[in-house]
Curated annotation (Swiss-Prot):
Residues 30-59 are annotated as: NMP. It is an enzyme of class 2 (transferase). This is Adenylate kinase. It catalyses: AMP + ATP = 2 ADP. GO terms for cellular component: cytoplasm. Belongs to the adenylate kinase family. Keywords: ATP-binding, Cytoplasm, Kinase, Nucleotide biosynthesis, Nucleotide-binding, Transferase. Residues 126-136 are annotated as: LID.
């Protein structure tokens, strides 16, 4: 199973990806985790990324794709993988499709976790309070959600046009959402 999980901040992507990893016995790949690991390892791509981040710039799609290509070349992804939160824009979606085609591992499905914006604000604000983070105030969360909507809505359409998209209601208990994802994937 080669799967992408999409959803706005607070939708439960990371939580469900961890659960799907256990269910399908395939690795959960987060580009954020990849980036941190490459920087920590001091790899050539990690050093490039560190330099970019030190300037306060965003890591380029090219660097992210290079890291992803290296990760997808590892033995543990032979039976599939779960990509969490990537691609975030249509350029990344096209690049990912090209990469997966090149290595003969096309996506099986893309799951979009749908959660109403106001509930997302509540979830993130609650999580921020529990973790003592003051930067996740409702206004900044709304801005992050708007950025997500602006950049990711076209990605949803991209995969919908290719017949790969499954929309799943992300509201409910962890087990209920996992069950819905399983049903959407025909499991």
């Amino acid at each position: 199973m080669r799967l992408v999980l999409l959803g706005p901040p607070g939708s439960g992507k990371g939580t469900q990806a961890a659960r799907l990893k256990d269910t399908f016995q395939i690795p959960h790949i987060s580009t954020g985790d990849l980036l941190r690991a490459e920087v920590a390892a001091g790899s050539p791509l990690g050093l490039k990324a560190k330099e970019v981040m030190a300037r306060g710039d965003l890591v380029s799609d090219e660097i992210l794709l290079g890291m992803l290509e290296a990760r997808l070349g590892q033995a543990d992804v032979a039976n599939g993988f779960i990509l969490d939160g990537y691609p975030r824009n249509v350029a990344q979606a096209n690049a990912l499709d090209s990469l997966l085609s090149k290595i003969g591992q096309p996506l099986d499905a893309v799951v979009q976790l749908d959660v109403a914006s106001e509930l997302l604000v509540e979830r993130i604000a609650g999580r921020a309070k529990a973790e003592g983070r003051e930067d996740d105030n409702p206004e900044s969360v709304r801005k992050r959600l708007q950025v997500y909507t602006d950049s990711t809505a076209p990605v949803i359409g991209f995969y919908e046009q290719r017949g790969k998209l499954a929309r799943v209601d992300g509201v409910g208990s962890l087990d209920e959402v996992l069950e819905r994802i399983g049903q959407a994937l025909g499991r």
